[in-house]
C-alpha cells in the first residue's frame, strides 16, 4: 500500500508516517519496504509512537526556549523509586513481582489517561497503588525525569494546548498508517487522532481478536469503533488465515465468535491441509507434565508448549532438566522464585529446620495465625523468652499458658518438629492445610497455582535438603536459560504472538489460570482471556493439542473448543435465569438474580456477596440449582 501511495498516487513519501509498535518493527518494515522496491522509490517515514513524541517535545523545547525532563531509559532507576515508595507506604520490602506489577500498573494508568481521582487500588488490583503512584510521579518531577509513558502524556498535552505545534506535524505527515493497531493504547490513539484531524487520512491494520495486552492498556475499542471515531471511515475485513490448517481455523473461529466486542468475521483457512485438533485427557497437572515429558522425548519437528503464566513451565522445566532433554525457553522470567507465597513456604521450611530463629518466626507467624492466634506482642514475647531460655519457639509456645492455644499450639509444634521426617511435598501440603497458610492465601486473594507448582517440584525430591537445593538450581536455570534454537519450545502465549509452530500443545487450560481468576466478574476481561486462547490456538500450523485436565469439570475454554468440533458449542440460552429468579450455587449458597445479560447473570447472594457468572459454565459444571422466582415474595 505504501508503494502504491508513492508510485501510483504520487504522494510525497516525506508526508507519509507509518507508526509501528516497537523499534524492531520499524527496522523490519523498512527492510521489507526496501526488499519490495529495491530503492526504486524513496523510503517513507517509519517511527514508533514514542519516537514521534520525542519530536513533538523537541519542537516544544525550541519554540518555548525550555528544556524537557531527561528520559529514564534504565528500568533499574524507576524500579528503585518504586521500591522506595513501596517501603515508605507499605512498611515492607517489595518482591521482584511487586515491583513488576506496580511498573505495569503505572504504565496502564498513564496509557489509559486515568486521573488520580478516577480509580482506586481495587480498580488497579495493586494494594497501596495510589500512594506509590503519587510517590513515583513526585520523585520523577523532583529529579526532572520522565519515563517512556510520560513522553506520550507530555506530547499529547502539547498537541492539545499548542495548535501551532499540532499544525506543524499535521502539515508534515498528511497520511498516517498504523500497524498492529490492536496493541495501541488509548493515549496513542488520541495522539494519532489529533494528528489526522486536519487531513483525515488514516489507515490502520489490526485485529481486535488478537488484542491481548490489556494489562499494558491496549485499546481494541478504537478498532471496534473505527467508523464512529473517524468520519467517512471504511472497514475492510481480512478473513483468510494463511497459517493454520482447516480444523484449527474452524475451532479457533468458533471460539472467538463468542466475543461480542468485535467486527463479525468468518475466518477461512487458505491451507488445503485438514490438520488436527486433539484434546488430551489427563487426571491432573502431574499427569499433564508427564505427557509433555513423553512428547519432548519423542516429538518430530518444531513443537511448542504454550501457557498463560511463566510459572506453569517450572515443573516441566524441572522434569526436562532431570532427563537432560534439550529445550528452548522464550523470554524467561524468574519472578516466581521471589513471589511472596514461594518465599513464605521456604521460610516456614527454614524455620522448621531452625525453630529458634526469631527473625524467621516474626516473618511467618501471622501468616499461619489461624492456628497460632498470636498478637504481635505475644509473638515478640515468645521470641524473647526463647532467646533468654535457649528453648525453641515451639517449645516456648507449648509451655507458656500466655501463648498456648489448646491443641492448636501442639499441632503447630508437631508439624514443625516433623519437617525432616515428611516428604517435601507432604510437608508443604501440611503448611497449607494444617497450619492454615491456605486460609491466609484465600484472605489475601493469592491464587493456589504457586502452591501447586511448589508441590509438583517437591514431589520429585526425596528429602527437604534436596528440595531446597533443587529450588536454587531451578531458579538459576529459569533466570539464565537462553533461547538456543532447539525445536522443542516453551513459551507464554504473549511471547508467542506473531510466531508459528508446526505442532502446538496448550497446557494449564483451567478456570483460574486461562481464563484467569475472577474473569466471570468482568465480561470485558473475560473476552480478553478468550482472545488470548484464540491467539494460542492460531499459533499452530498443522496440529493443535489442548490438555483437558478434568479435575473439577472441563475448563470453560476447553468446553467451547470441543463444542465447535462436536457441533454442541453454541451458547446456551435455554433456561437462563431471569431477574428476580432465585438460584442455589453449590459454593456460595442461595441468592437472587439481579441482572441478566446474554449468557451472563449477576447474583446477589444471601450471605452478602454479589458475583457475575457465565450461566453456561455454571450449568455444565453442575454448580447451579434453580429455585422459584423471588419476585412478589414467591
Predicted feature locations:
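P-loop NTPase Walker
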Residues: 1-67, 167, 250-253, 597
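Conserved helicase core region in the C-terminal RecA-like lobe
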Residues: 45-55, 177-180, 205, 309, ...
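ATPase/helicase motor core of nucleic-acid motors
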Residues: 274, 297-422, 438
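C-terminal accessory regions
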Residues: 509-615, 620-634
Amino acid at each position: 500500500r505504501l508503494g502504491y501511495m508513492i508510485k501510483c498516487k504520487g504522494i510525497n513519501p516525506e508526508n507519509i508516517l507509518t507508526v509501528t509498535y516497537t523499534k524492531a518493527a520499524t527496522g523490519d518494515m523498512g527492510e521489507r519496504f526496501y526488499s519490495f522496491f529495491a530503492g526504486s522509490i524513496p523510503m517513507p517515514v517509519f517511527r514508533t509512537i514514542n519516537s514521534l513524541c520525542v519530536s513533538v517535545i523537541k519542537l516544544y523545547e525550541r519554540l518555548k526556549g525550555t528544556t524537557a525532563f531527561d528520559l529514564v531509559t534504565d528500568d533499574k532507576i524507576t524500579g528503585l523509586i518504586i521500591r522506595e515508595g513501596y517501603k515508605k507506604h507499605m512498611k515492607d520490602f517489595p518482591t521482584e513481582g511487586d515491583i513488576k506489577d506496580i511498573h505495569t500498573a503505572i504504565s496502564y494508568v498513564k496509557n489509559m489517561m486515568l486521573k488520580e481521582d478516577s480509580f482506586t487500588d481495587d480498580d488497579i488490583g495493586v494494594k497501596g497503588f495510589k500512594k506509590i503512584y503519587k510517590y513515583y510521579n513526585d520523585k520523577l518531577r523532583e529529579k526532572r525525569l520522565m519515563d517512556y509513558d510520560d513522553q506520550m502524556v507530555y506530547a499529547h498535552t502539547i498537541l492539545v494546548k499548542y495548535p501551532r505545534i499540532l499544525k506543524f506535524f499535521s502539515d508534515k505527515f498528511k497520511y498516517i498508517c498504523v500497524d498492529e493497531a490492536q496493541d495501541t493504547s488509548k493515549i496513542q490513539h488520541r495522539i494519532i487522532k489529533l494528528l489526522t484531524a486536519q487531513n483525515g487520512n488514516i489507515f490502520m491494520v489490526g485485529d481486535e481478536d488478537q488484542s491481548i495486552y490489556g494489562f499494558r492498556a491496549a485499546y481494541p475499542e478504537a478498532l471496534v469503533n473505527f467508523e464512529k471515531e473517524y468520519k467517512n471511515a471504511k472497514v475492510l475485513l481480512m478473513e483468510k488465515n494463511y497459517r493454520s490448517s482447516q480444523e484449527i481455523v474452524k475451532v479457533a473461529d468458533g471460539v472467538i465468535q463468542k466475543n461480542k466486542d468485535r467486527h463479525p468475521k468468518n475466518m477461512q483457512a487458505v491451507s488445503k491441509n485438514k490438520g488436527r485438533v486433539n484434546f488430551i485427557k489427563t487426571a491432573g497437572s502431574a499427569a499433564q507434565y508427564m505427557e509433555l515429558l513423553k512428547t519432548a522425548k519423542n516429538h518430530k519437528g518444531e513443537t511448542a508448549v504454550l501457557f498463560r503464566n511463566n510459572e506453569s513451565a517450572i515443573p516441566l522445566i524441572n522434569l526436562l532438566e532431570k532427563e537432560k532433554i534439550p529445550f528452548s525457553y522464550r523470554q524467561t522470567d524468574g519472578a516466581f522464585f521471589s513471589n511472596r507465597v514461594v518465599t513464605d513456604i521456604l521460610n516456614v521450611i527454614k524455620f522448621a529446620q531452625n525453630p529458634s530463629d526469631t527473625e524467621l518466626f516474626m516473618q511467618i507467624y501471622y501468616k499461619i495465625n489461624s492456628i497460632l492466634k498470636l498478637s504481635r506482642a505475644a509473638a515478640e514475647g515468645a521470641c524473647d523468652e526463647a532467646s533468654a531460655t535457649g528453648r525453641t519457639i515451639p517449645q516456648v509456645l507449648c509451655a507458656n499458658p500466655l501463648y498456648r492455644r489448646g491443641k492448636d499450639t501442639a499441632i503447630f509444634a508437631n508439624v514443625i518438629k516433623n519437617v525432616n521426617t515428611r516428604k517435601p511435598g507432604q510437608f508443604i501440603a501440611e503448611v497449607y492445610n494444617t497450619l492454615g497458610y491456605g486460609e491466609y492465601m484465600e484472605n489475601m486473594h493469592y491464587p493456589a497455582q504457586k502452591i501447586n507448582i511448589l508441590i509438583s517440584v517437591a514431589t520429585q525430591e526425596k528429602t527437604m535438603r534436596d528440595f531446597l537445593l533443587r529450588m536454587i538450581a531451578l531458579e538459576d536455570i529459569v533466570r539464565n536459560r537462553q533461547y538456543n534454537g532447539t525445536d522443542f519450545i516453551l513459551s507464554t502465549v504473549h511471547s508467542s504472538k506473531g510466531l508459528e509452530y508446526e505442532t502446538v500443545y496448550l497446557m494449564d487450560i483451567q478456570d483460574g489460570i486461562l481464563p484467569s481468576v475472577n474473569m466471570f466478574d468482568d465480561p470485558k476481561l473475560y473476552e480478553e482471556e478468550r482472545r488470548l486462547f484464540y491467539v494460542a490456538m492460531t499459533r499452530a500450523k498443522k496440529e493443535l493439542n489442548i490438555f483437558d485436565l478434568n479435575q473439577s469439570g472441563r475448563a470453560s475454554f476447553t468446553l467451547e473448543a470441543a463444542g465447535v468440533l462436536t457441533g454442541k458449542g453454541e451458547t446456551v440460552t435455554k433456561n437462563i435465569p431471569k431477574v428476580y429468579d432465585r438460584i442455589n450455587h453449590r459454593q456460595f449458597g442461595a441468592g437472587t438474580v439481579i441482572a441478566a445479560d446474554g449468557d451472563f447473570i449477576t447474583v446477589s447472594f444471601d450471605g452478602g456477596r454479589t458475583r457475575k457468572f457465565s450461566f453456561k459454565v455454571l450449568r455444565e459444571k453442575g454448580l447451579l440449582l434453580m429455585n422459584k422466582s423471588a419476585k412478589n415474595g414467591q
